Amino acid sequence: MAQAKISAKAHEGRFCRSSSMADRSSRLLESLDQLELRVEALRDAATAVEQEKEILLEMIHSIQNSQDMRQISDGEREELNLTANRLMGRTLTVEVSVETIRNPQQEESLKHATRIIDEVVSKFLDDLGNAKSHLMSLYSACSSEVPPGPVDQKFQSIVIGCALEDQKKIKRRLETLLRNIDNSDKAIKLLEHAKGAGSKSLQNTDGKFN
């Protein structure tokens, strides 16, 4: 009888300890789940800051190279450029880095995709029109929507092999490059139009004097 009571108490003790350990384990797991959500929120916030920095730099650069900037006095342009350079300098002081965890295959895919884009960018000065068409096909390869033009199937398979965060960064880089090309095209057309108007004005003036 005494032995039975001792055994029962020992069994009860083991049960209590086991139940207590399970509760602790459950609480710890719940805490880690909550921390994981906060970690992902932190990464998302840092990525958003990183993107905002890129957008700000692009906007400042766009203003400095805008047609409006060419059509003001030298003194005003110098003053505005000083302000733009100051803003750019302050923007560059913000350092944000979100490292992406990659396996060797994803690392290689990212290098391959980056190399392809860099090769297209290097041809901007030689043939901007062809480079833009090539960039459009690369961008279409990254789009989940029905592309308006041809898709670079080889590039698409390479991008699919990249980490998800890298896929988003590749798409953003292509968007930025295409916007810069469009802005350059507009600036060139406006400049040519201004030159053409100036040339006609001079011809009319010459005609009057003749």
From Swiss-Prot:
- What keywords is this UniProt entry annotated with? Acetylation, Chaperone, Coiled coil, Phosphoprotein
Q: Where is the signal peptide?
A: none
What Gene Ontology terms describe what this protein does at the molecular function level?
Answer: adenyl-nucleotide exchange factor activity; heat shock protein binding; identical protein binding; protein-folding chaperone binding; tau protein binding; transmembrane transporter binding; ubiquitin protein ligase binding
User: Looking at the keywords, is Transmembrane present?
Assistant: no
Domain spans labelled BAG: 109-189
Phosphoserine modification sites?
20, 31, 73
GO terms under cellular component:
axon; dendrite; protein folding chaperone complex
Q: What does this protein do?
A: Co-chaperone for HSP70 and HSC70 chaperone proteins. Acts as a nucleotide-exchange factor (NEF) promoting the release of ADP from the HSP70 and HSC70 proteins thereby triggering client/substrate protein release.
Q: How does it assemble?
A: Binds to the ATPase domain of HSP/HSC70 chaperones. May interact with NWD1. Interacts with HSPA1A (via NBD), HSPA1B (via NBD) and HSPA8. May interact with DNJC9; the interaction seems to be histone-dependent.
Q: What is this protein called?
A: BAG family molecular chaperone regulator 2
The species is Mus musculus
What taxonomic ancestry is recorded?
Eukaryota, Metazoa, Chordata, Craniata, Vertebrata
Q: Which gene encodes it?
A: Bag2
